[in-house]
Regions:
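Glycine-rich P-loop/Walker A and Walker A-like loops and their local beta1-loop-alpha1 context
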Residues: 7-9, 16-58, 235-237
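Phosphate-binding/switch loop-helix module in NTP-utilizing enzymes
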Residues: 89-148, 286, 297
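G-domain G4 guanine-recognition motif of GTPases
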Residues: 160, 182-184, 306-307, 332-344, ...
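Canonical P-loop GTPase G-domain recognition
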Residues: 341-388
């Protein structure tokens, strides 16, 4: 198994990339996607994998320096694990073999020789220069039948200038075990980079665009908004506070002398390798006009109900309808205060709230941090793994 080094992605892939797989990282214009391959390379050599890097656009020293500046990864510390074909090697092969067929044979011989001599586990290929010379299919075919006595994983990076339609046409002819499409400014939330698991041959996963940010050269998968909504005093503020590593709420004393949220709760946490922002909406009816704005671009909705107050189900249904709007997003129902005496059943909740089949319903106590975290873990799975 080859780990990508991105915890959320490795989790989605159920551990990483199986040995012997072919992976394609297709980067669309303006997407900040080159760090995926850099992180993969660094993770591989740290774990002792012998790696061949084919970078026809630069020298080995310049490549190492550039990565150290971008990501603070010092690959020179693992020099004995990294074989390299650099710009001067590429130019020499082309110069000495002006005929394309002999050039192709020279490339294949050189790659096979390094793989066998150095016991290579992983090949990192920057494909653009090779595809300009041999075309895409011809460049990829250089890595057929490597003659190794062990499975060799190959990760290609390719700048896809023509979008998903072009990518689909390529993949109809050339199969890969893993295809990750890296995009900018599309999907559920604008102004973020997105990665889409286009193909995962060993798993059944929906093709879904998930945001990520790049900070100091490192990939951070990101869920910018999960909304927690529900009637007043259903436990939203307690829930958000209990799951958050940092956050704030805007509240004042209600008629019963207890704090009641009049604006929103904001929390931040990490789950399954994702950085997550949590927004709790006010439950009072007079704030309904602002709830759609608070819920705009949410990637998931947690609907909280008080199981000791079945009379509030109609209000909960109204809030669910407002938050969902016309968008189809995953919903989880949290039946809070399950540590107290109550009589409402899961079936009654499902009927009253008109929730879709398969929607999880969790009976919890919002003061129990472990139970609250389990709800967020489930929401991450709903967002990333399941059809909705």
């Amino acid at each position: 198994m080859i780990y990508t080094g991105i915890d959320a992605l490795d989790g989605l892939l159920e551990g990483g990339i199986p040995d012997g797989s072919r992976a394609l990282f297709a980067i669309e214009p303006e997407a900040d996607g080159q760090h995926f391959l850099i992180t993969l390379l660094h993770t591989a050599v740290v774990s002792g994998k012998k790696t061949l890097v084919i970078a026809p656009f630069t020298s080995k020293d310049a490549y190492f320096v550039d990565i150290a500046i971008q990501s603070h990864y010092h690959l020179d510390c693992y020099d004995e694990l990294i074989s390299f074909l650099e710009q001067s090697d590429v130019e020499a092969i082309i110069r000495e073999n002006p005929d394309q067929d002999t050039c192709r044979a020279a490339w294949r011989d050189r790659i096979r020789s390094i793989v066998k001599k150095d016991g290579i586990d992983l090949i990192i290929v920057y494909l653009d220069v090779l595809s300009d010379y041999f075309d895409f299919a011809g460049a990829v075919s250089l890595f057929d039948d490597l003659g190794s006595d062990k499975p060799v994983t190959i990760a290609f990076e390719y700048f896809n200038l023509f979008g998903e339609e072009m990518l689909n046409s390529i993949l109809e002819e050339i199969p890969f075990d893993l295809v990750i499409n890296l995009q900018s400014g599309s999907g559920v939330v604008s102004f973020f980079n997105f990665f889409t698991l286009h193909t995962v041959s060993w798993l059944s996963l929906p093709s879904r665009s998930l945001p990520y940010i790049v900070t100091e050269g490192h990939i951070v998968p990101y869920i910018p908004k999960i909304v927690v909504t529900g009637p007043s005093n259903s436990g939203k503020t307690t829930f958000v506070k209990n799951i958050s590593e940092s956050g704030m709420s805007v509240d004042r004393l209600g008629l019963l002398g207890t704090p009641t949220t009049v604006a929103l709760d904001i929390g931040h946490m990490a789950s399954k390798g994702f950085d997550i922002n949590i927004y709790g909406t006010p439950g009072q009816e007079r704030f309904d006009p602002i709830v759609p704005q608070l819920a705009r671009n949410a990637m998931g909705v947690i609907l909280m109900v008080d199981v000791t107050r079945p009379d509030q189900m109609a209000r909960a249904l109204k809030l669910k309808t407002i938050v969902e709007g016309n968008a189809l997003v995953p919903v989880i129902v949290v039946a809070n205060k399950a540590d107290l005496e109550y009589s409402v059943t899961e079936e009654e909740i499902r009927t009253a709230l008109e929730i879709r089949p398969g929607t999880p319903v969790y009976f919890i106590s919002a003061i129990n941090r472990r139970q609250c975290r389990a709800v967020i873990d489930s929401m991450v799975d709903q967002i990333t793994r399941f059809e909705y």
